[in-house]
Regions:
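Surface-exposed, charge/polar-rich loops and edge strands
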Residues: 1-204
Length: 204
């Protein structure tokens, strides 16, 4: 959707006779009943620890999180504000401490916000999730094993799994006129690319 909007803006700039009813002014939208939607976790993998050793990074996390080492068995976040981390061959449970999130702020209470503010920005110096080459995103539909694989391969240094955003959180954000942070939700069912094509060329 964001990409379609950007393309539309580019087309407007290239068209000196823009009217507002051209095909590039529109994009596909679809509605599903909330009861038939499933929101899956959207996870993060990071290429480096910003100069820290694994031990130093774990120690730095303790300021804002209760840290428990789980070991080799895959750990899935159990509730809101609980995260799974895979680092140096082991899984950890990270539970955000009180004061790291704002229950009265529909954006500030999101786990993606907590992780971005307290870990990615504060410790790893990743300021912009959209442009940083040091971070990548893995849809939960691919499983936690994919996070472990990418770290064990040496491609990434650490992985974080998040508890899925609830439908209530999503609706609260929409109702207050806010915008979800990038890479927050993975919806199922997901429309397949190319099934429906909207041509920008007039008359097609």
């Amino acid at each position: 959707t964001a990409a379609a909007a950007r393309v539309g803006e580019e087309c407007i700039l290239r068209n000196p006779n823009h009217r507002g009813d051209e095909e590039y002014c529109f994009f596909l939208a679809v509605t599903f009943p909330a009861s038939q939607l499933r929101i899956i976790d959207y996870n993060r993998v990071v290429r480096d620890l910003n100069g820290m050793t694994p031990a130093e990074f774990v120690e730095a996390l303790r300021t804002d999180f209760e840290v428990e080492k789980i070991g080799g068995e895959v750990y899935r976040p159990a509730r809101l504000h609980n995260f799974a981390m895979y680092l140096d061959g082991a899984w950890y449970s990270l539970t955000a401490r009180e004061g790291t999130y704002d229950d009265d702020d529909p954006i500030g209470v999101l786990d993606v916000t907590v992780l971005s503010n307290r870990v990615l920005d504060k410790l790893l110096d990743i300021k912009d999730l959209r442009t940083s080459k040091r971070i990548d995103f893995v849809g939960g539909i691919r499983g936690l094993g994919e996070l472990r694989r990418r770290v064990d391969s040496g491609e990434m240094k650490v992985a974080f799994a998040l508890y899925p955003v609830s439908m209530k959180q999503l609706i609260d954000i929409a109702d207050t006129g806010n915008i979800m942070p990038p890479k927050t939700t993975w919806f199922e069912p997901k429309l397949r690319s190319g099934v429906v094509i909207h041509s920008f060329e007039e008359g097609k």
